[in-house]
Amino acid sequence: MEIAVVGKSEFVVGFRLAGIHKTYEVKNDKDLESKIRECLTDRNLGIIVLHSDDLKHISPGLQKVIDESVEPTFIAIGSKEDAGLRDKIKRAIGVDLWK
């Protein structure tokens, strides 16, 4: 399983420098949704990282798919810790890492 990062250039560049190969730069909300949908069909992806601010620009239908997705698991970073992250990790691997 691989990790993918989707977002604006300034967000994905750090991940690219850290060795993540599947980084996808998007220019606008339409590109963001398109790339997320493309990532959902890639069976090699286990985790997809997004910036939390980008989630505000995603359609409600795709937001629901992201929220309910176990594989790949979506991780939104860039803001305060979200209790949803804990639940997603627990669903994905079956273990509560915070205990």
Swiss-Prot record:
One of its GO terms (cellular component) is plasma membrane. Its main location: membrane. It comes from Methanocella arvoryzae (strain DSM 22066 / NBRC 105507 / MRE50). GO terms for molecular function: ATP binding; proton-transporting ATP synthase activity, rotational mechanism; proton-transporting ATPase activity, rotational mechanism. Coiled coil: none annotated. This is A-type ATP synthase subunit F. NCBIfam families: PRK02228.1. Keywords: ATP synthesis, Cell membrane, Hydrogen ion transport, Ion transport, Membrane, Transport. It comes from the Archaea.
